[in-house]
Amino acid sequence: MARTEVVVLGSGFAGLETAFRLRARASEDDVGVTVVSERDDFLFRPGTVRLPFGAAEEPLHVPLHRAFRRRGIATVIATAEGIDLDRGQVHTSRGPMAYDRLVVATGAASRPEEIPGVAEHAHSIATPGALHRLGEDLRWMAQNARHGRAQRVLFALPPGNHCAAPLYELALMLDTWLRRKQIRDNVEIAFDTCEETYVQAFGPKLHALVSRQFEARGIDSRTASTLAEAAERSAVFADGSVREFDVLVAFPPQVASVGYAGLPADDRGFLRCDPDTRAVTGRPEVYAPGDAGDFPLKLGHLALLQADAVAAAIIAHRTGAQLSARRVPVVRHVLDMLDDAAFAQIPLSPGGDPAHVDEASARYWASTSVLWRAGARLAETALSARFRLGLPLRAGRAAFRHGPEITHRNTDTLMEKP
């Protein structure tokens, strides 16, 4: 049987987990894997929320060239420009590449221009550079507060964003940071979200937890409050209310980072996919795990689960094996608050809305502890270490071989264990 050529576009959570999982389950003779990316490292994006408060960026970057070479994965530093579906080729800035199976993991991008004034007057939190600039403004703000000048920081979450949690983290971390500097009394923190409840995608238990945190910390917050326009020092909301600010922080609406003509997508360019395998609708040879797909919640943990499903589908297609029954994923997320953290385990309901929380499940819970923050940092270190070695997050001892895995329980384990 001829070798199956798999081209993976992107080197984020979804792209790397797919590539490394494939290599853990198939030899180079069986499956060729090529990763096409604009960068030669992996960025642990969840950790970038710490950048405005003095954390170093360098530890968040994981070099990949040795991992790719060690695992027999080809890499091309290039930009994806389009797909020729009829010929089975992806066009890149370095030329065309043929594929048997294509994994589109090019992620999401922010579009601040959808809301007048946001691009000009708000700090986005979508990139490390933007978070560094926010940190500079926060330090100026803190200096003003130390000299007795009252300051106002406003956080705003508009519609069209599918990853709300980092904005909540930044607001809570800012409160802790200001208290450490003993200037919290001179800074007003406000939080407006278009959601009906706080961190709505995570259900009522996260809403209750965040509500308690906001109240205890004196953060003036509103739900169902939609940012309509931003000016130099004021924000106008859809209900006509106005908030003044010295620093405005927003997580703008999201769209697909790359548009692909000929592939079905929603109104924001996210590719429509089969919920089980993440195969693009009508194109069984193309997959879209992670943020590039249409799953309405964008999280690193979900990207890893979806990548494992994609790798399993590709291996099953090659071997003729039957795919195991789909398990409804259990989302796990840590909300960093700088001094401690909240941990949430969120089982999603089967059927209907794929991101609907199963509120009746005994596995649905949330709590706050300094231990969760330590655990999150350990998990970050573990993932970075495995990616540095060219290994998927969880693949057992089989990942150290180029041959197929003996066990096939890894994806289920990732879904079910804390």
Tell where the protein language model's regions lie, with residue ranges.
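FAD-site-proximal beta/loop scaffold in flavoenzymes
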Residues: 119-149, 242-306
